[in-house]
């Protein structure tokens, strides 16, 4: 567990680990380039034993939210944070998104940030804004996913998302007007374009 918010003007950057065998909490000492004090970010355990931290929001000195699109990596053996090199179409700054491991990639969907909903379909004119972005775990390259579904996912934030047997489930959240209990299921795959380069599709 990392970070958090006290509901007022303070965010946290401390880390806590729960031992499921002894049922005790510990606060490990970490080093390196740790994320700032924030909340609403995501943590994903990669196949190489590193924890990836993306996005989130912190409270600025004037009380104005500061949104992030940083990607940090924690080596769980050395407990050292780093900023891995990543390329491609970087996601816009956001929080309350979901980043879900799907095969050898991470699917980033939803969130709230500069301009509101992080989707051009919702009227956000922020350059490079996209609701669904995929990070290749091997090449560390971001790509905007192409939606082939005539009924695409309803944009939201504060939702939950999980992958089950190649299908991406999104439930709940806030759609900008009200809380929702909608459940969306989409199939995630890869298609090859003319140049042979694969692009993620949903």
Language-model-detected regions and their locations in the chain:
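Kelch-like beta-propeller repeat domains
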Residues: 1-202
């Amino acid at each position: 567990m990392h970070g958090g918010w006290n509901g007022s003007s303070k965010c946290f950057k401390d880390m806590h680990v729960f031992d499921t065998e002894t049922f005790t909490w510990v606060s490990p000492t970490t080093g390196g380039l740790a994320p700032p004090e924030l909340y609403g970010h995501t943590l994903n355990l990669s196949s190489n034993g590193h924890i990836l931290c993306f996005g989130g929001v912190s409270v600025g000195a004037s009380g104005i939210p500061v949104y992030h699109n940083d990607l940090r990596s924690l080596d769980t053996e050395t407990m050292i944070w780093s900023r891995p090199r990543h390329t491609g179409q970087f996601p816009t700054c956001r929080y309350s998104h979901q980043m879900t491991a799907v095969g050898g990639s991470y699917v980033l969907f939803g969130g709230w940030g500069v301009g509101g909903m992080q989707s051009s379909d919702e009227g956000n004119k922020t350059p490079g804004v996209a609701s669904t972005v995929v990070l290749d775990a091997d090449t560390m390259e971001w790509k905007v996913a192409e939606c082939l579904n005539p009924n695409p996912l309803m944009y939201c934030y504060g939702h939950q998302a999980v992958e089950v047997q190649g299908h991406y489930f999104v439930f709940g959240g806030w759609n900008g007007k009200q809380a929702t209990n909608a459940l969306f299921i989409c199939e995630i795959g890869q298609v090859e374009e003319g140049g042979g380069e694969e692009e993620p599709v949903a």
